[in-house]
């Protein structure tokens, strides 16, 4: 099965080799028919500490690296300040 890839914004990069990424998704509410935005935060493994707060990055699913880390940083998209 292919690994999931998501894009999100780095919320925190203070920990060593870890970036916390906020991923936003939109969907239509089944009853209200209104577009709803929902966000999740994921702990991603950042081997080279390249992530910077506010940066948009892609993360990929991987084998568990710690209690919370099940994602790894794949590529940087650009910076937003």
Curated annotation (Swiss-Prot):
Family annotation (SUPFAM superfamilies): Nucleic acid-binding proteins
Keyword vocabulary terms for this entry: Ribonucleoprotein, Ribosomal protein, RNA-binding, rRNA-binding
InterPro entries referenced in this protein's UniProt entry, alphabetically: NA-bd_OB-fold (IPR012340), Ribosomal_uS17 (IPR000266), Ribosomal_uS17_bact/chlr (IPR019984)
Highest taxon above the source species: Bacteria
MF terms in GO: rRNA binding; structural constituent of ribosome
Gene Ontology CC terms, in alphabetical order: cytosolic small ribosomal subunit
GO process terms (BP): translation
Pfam families: Ribosomal_S17 (PF00366)
Family in the record: Belongs to the universal ribosomal protein uS17 family.
PANTHER family in the record: 40S RIBOSOMAL PROTEIN S11 FAMILY MEMBER, SMALL RIBOSOMAL SUBUNIT PROTEIN US17M
Its biological purpose: One of the primary rRNA binding proteins, it binds specifically to the 5'-end of 16S ribosomal RNA.
Subunit comment: Part of the 30S ribosomal subunit.
Name of protein: Small ribosomal subunit protein uS17
Species name: Hyphomonas neptunium (strain ATCC 15444)
């Amino acid at each position: 099965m292919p690994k999931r890839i998501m894009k999100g914004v780095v919320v925190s990069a203070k920990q060593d080799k870890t970036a916390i990424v906020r991923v936003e998704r939109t969907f239509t509410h089944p009853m209200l028919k209104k577009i709803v935005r929902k966000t999740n935060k994921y702990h991603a493994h950042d081997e080279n500490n390249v992530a910077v707060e506010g940066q948009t990055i892609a993360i990929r699913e991987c084998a568990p690296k710690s209690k919370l880390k099940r994602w790894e940083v794949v590529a940087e998209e650009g910076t937003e300040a």
